[in-house]
């Protein structure tokens, strides 16, 4: 069993407002993220993602940053972080992100018309974040080469499914009876 799968099976579950969350180093920063787990995930992303001709890796703050930084270092592809803070810089594009549990305004800089991008995130659950990002990138005129999320939490409505985009994932899980259940250890292609 690989480290990602094992770490998810051992993840604590919390409930907040009727929504069951697994607490995991990739999605939450706790417990501590072991380098071997991060390395395994980065290697899997590099093997699964379409990286040819990608100009930029685009990721939302905050929990996509550590994964995307490591992928950027391994591939020499520059990293763009979509932030929750507006700076008012030239070319800044706002987007509205709505998930099953939060709503935020986010801001994209340094992505231009014609850029070929890989969208990378930690978890695909409701699809609200990735759907909003893909829509904003499309409005900018960027070419979305691929979308990858490390973990897919199945069992709920996924906004990305009703968009023209789909996400590759490394592993698909659900939370049943207070435990993480592995639905597909290879994720979606």
UniProtKB/Swiss-Prot annotation:
Domain of life from the UniProt record: Archaea
Keywords attached to this entry: Purine salvage, Transferase
A molecular function GO annotation: transferase activity
Top EC category: transferase
Key word Signal present: no
Known function: May catalyze a purine salvage reaction, the substrate is unknown.
Listed name of the protein: HGPRTase-like protein
Species of the source: Natronomonas pharaonis (strain ATCC 35678 / DSM 2160 / CIP 103997 / JCM 8858 / NBRC 14720 / NCIMB 2260 / Gabara) (Halobacterium pharaonis)
């Amino acid at each position: 069993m690989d480290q990602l799968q094992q770490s998810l099976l051992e993840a604590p579950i919390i409930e907040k407002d009727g929504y069951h969350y697994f607490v995991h180093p990739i999605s939450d920063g706790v417990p501590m993220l072991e380098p071997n787990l991060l390395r395994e995930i980065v290697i899997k992303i590099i093997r699964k993602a379409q990286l040819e001709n990608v100009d930029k890796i685009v990721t939302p703050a905050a929990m996509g940053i550590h994964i995307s930084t490591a992928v950027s270092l391994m591939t020499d592809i520059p990293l763009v972080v979509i932030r929750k803070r507006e700076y008012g810089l030239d070319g800044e594009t706002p987007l509205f992100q709505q998930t099953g549990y939060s709503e935020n305004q986010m801001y994209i800089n340094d992505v231009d018309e014609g850029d070929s991008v890989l969208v990378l995130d930690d978890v695909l659950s409701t699809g609200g974040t990735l759907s909003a990002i893909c829509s904003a990138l499309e409005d900018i005129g960027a070419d979305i080469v691929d979308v990858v999320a490390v973990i897919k939490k199945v069992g709920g409505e996924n906004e990305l499914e009703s968009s023209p985009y789909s996400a590759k994932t490394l592993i698909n899980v659900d939370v049943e009876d207070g435990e993480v259940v592995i639905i597909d250890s290879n994720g979606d292609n």
